[in-house]
A protein has these predicted regions:
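Short aromatic-glycine motifs in intrinsically disordered, low-complexity regions
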Residues: 48-55, 89-94, 244
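Extracellular beta-strand-rich solenoid/capping regions of secreted or surface-exposed proteins
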Residues: 71-78, 86-103, 109-128, 132-145, ...
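Right-handed parallel beta-helix
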Residues: 98-105, 122-133, 145-159, 169-190, ...
Length: 325
């Protein structure tokens, strides 16, 4: 498993460097985030490419506990590391500007009522937050957003999707999240008619996620090639695991499927079929992964190490979700 050590002072140094030029309000103190030494300091996969994904590094670190302060810093043109200590209640989809790290404090950081909308932005990190009860999506990445890292969150009970990525967004890593109590989990590409914007984009890595009893879309892919789905733990997914449609190319590698009748799918709804290469997956009381044109799935363009499929359940259940970084 790829694991790198995070220097405890990395984000603190960034905050100190900018403290003289950006003075937070009294309700938002400058502090160093408390991050355990075993957390990854940078994303694995696509979000490590295209210049990398650092979020608000280089800006001030602020702590917020209410929606007003959260919105003020999340929409600022300046870089910020925003520590969420408490419940942020939103009334709808809340815009997040470029160059932001939004990270929960311990297990106390929560977003409810609404979700986060990353629209035409670059370089955003969302970590260690509990999302529940969104009136639409919990996290929506769209309109050409790039270099996004969604890591170590707990997501459930959204009205639509939990993590939807669409409209030409690119260079995204979704890692170490726990998804539960949800039908539609992770959409990648929103429409069969959006080939012109999506082809050659929507490159996403899904790694070390815990798909815990969710029904479908883990992910549901259109057009993108290659999408890399590896070292995830699927359990009790009554619809399907990963789906490839509209000539997408998806590598489904070294995942652990438990009680999943249909680990992979190449046909959903009215979409044309996609291509899947499935290798090294560990199956417990699960069906055989369906593949199609595995040679059409492009090579993954970044270095990585995949853990053996049989070890993934223990790794993911010990490390995914909030309070684990």
């Amino acid at each position: 498993v790829i694991k790198t050590s995070l220097s405890a002072g990395t984000l603190a140094l960034a905050a100190l460097a900018a403290a003289g030029s950006a003075l937070p309000s009294a309700s938002a103190q400058i502090r160093a985030p408390m991050v355990q030494a075993n957390a990854e300091s940078a994303p694995v996969g696509y979000a490590s490419m295209n210049g990398g994904t650092t979020g608000g590094a280089g800006g001030a670190t602020v702590t917020v506990g209410n929606a007003a302060d959260f919105v003020r810093y999340a929409t600022s043109a300046s870089p910020y590391v925003i520590r969420v200590n408490g419940t942020i209640t939103l009334s709808g989809m809340q815009d997040v500007a470029s160059n932001k790290t939004i990270i929960g404090v311990g297990t106390s950081g929560r977003v409810t009522g609404g979700g986060l909308d990353l629209d035409s932005v670059r370089n955003v990190v969302i970590r260690n937050l509990t999302f529940t009860g969104a009136g639409d999506d919990a996290i929506n990445v769209q309109d050409g957003s790039t270099n996004i890292w969604i890591d170590h969150n707990d997501l459930s009970n959204a009205r639509d999707g939990l993590i939807d990525i669409k409209r030409g967004s690119d260079f995204v890593t979704v890692s170490w999240n726990r998804l539960h109590h949800q039908d539609k989990s992770m959409l990648l590409g929103h429409s069969d008619g959006n080939a012109s914007q999506d082809t050659g984009k929507l490159r996403v890595t899904y790694v070390h996620n815990w798909l815990d009893g969710t029904t479908q879309r883990h992910p549901r892919v259109r057009f993108a090639n290659p999408v890399h789905v590896f070292n995830n733990y699927y359990v009790n997914n009554s619809g399907y695991g990963a789906a490839s449609t509209e000539n997408a190319g998806v590598l489904v590698e070294n995942n652990y499927f438990e009680n999943v009748e249909e680990p992979t799918s190449i046909q959903e709804g009215s979409s044309d079929p996609g291509n899947i290469r499935a290798v090294g997956n560990h199956l417990v009381n699960s069906g055989t992964p369906v593949t199609r044109n595995p040679g059409a799935v492009k090579a993954v363009p970044y270095p990585y190490t995949a853990e053996a499929g049989g070890a993934v359940k223990a790794t993911v259940t010990a490390g995914a979700g909030v309070g684990r970084i």
